[in-house]
């Protein structure tokens, strides 16, 4: 957790520097660091939870922060890379994975038993971790090789505008 906090502080400092460009890959890695800390907490907390309401609140919290992250990735990041994903036969993979994670988080709200809700939530967390790992190992490095630094920075600026960070 301390590593993620240091990373988030470093990100905040970089965002405060008007003369520095923030690449979209830097932004997404920072968001992933925060998610991993949230996931660590959920994986520890869920087995101890005693009510459906507790599980549902955690799932809703993850969904609330995951949805804009997924939309940002799809709109600003995956879209410019789609021709390359198409060549690899992976054009729909990342969109589909985002939708599957969102569907799993929504399914927690419809679970009929505490055991089922816990299982669905933990499976959604596992799927998210696997998805993030694929992005961090394959997609982000590929983007940094394929896209120009200026493009990555412009996409980072678009993220700032969407999130209204620093305004």
Which residues fall in each region the model found?
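Small-residue-biased structural context
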Residues: 4-167
């Amino acid at each position: 957790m301390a590593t993620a906090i240091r990373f988030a502080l470093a990100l905040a400092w970089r965002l405060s520097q008007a003369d520095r460009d923030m690449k979209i890959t830097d932004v997404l890695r920072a968001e992933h660091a925060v998610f991993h800390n949230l996931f660590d907490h959920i994986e520890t907390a869920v087995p101890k939870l005693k009510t459906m309401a507790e599980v549902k609140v955690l799932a809703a919290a993850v969904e609330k922060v995951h949805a804009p992250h997924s939309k940002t990735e799809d709109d600003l990041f995956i879209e410019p890379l789609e021709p390359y994903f198409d060549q690899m036969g992976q054009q729909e993979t990342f969109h589909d994975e985002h939708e599957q994670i969102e569907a799993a988080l929504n399914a927690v709200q419809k679970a009929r038993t505490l055991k089922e809700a816990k299982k669905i939530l933990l499976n959604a967390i596992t799927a998210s971790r696997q998805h993030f790992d694929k992005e961090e190992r394959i997609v982000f490095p590929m983007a940094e090789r394929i896209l120009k630094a200026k493009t990555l920075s412009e996409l980072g600026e678009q993220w700032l505008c969407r999130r209204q960070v620093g305004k």
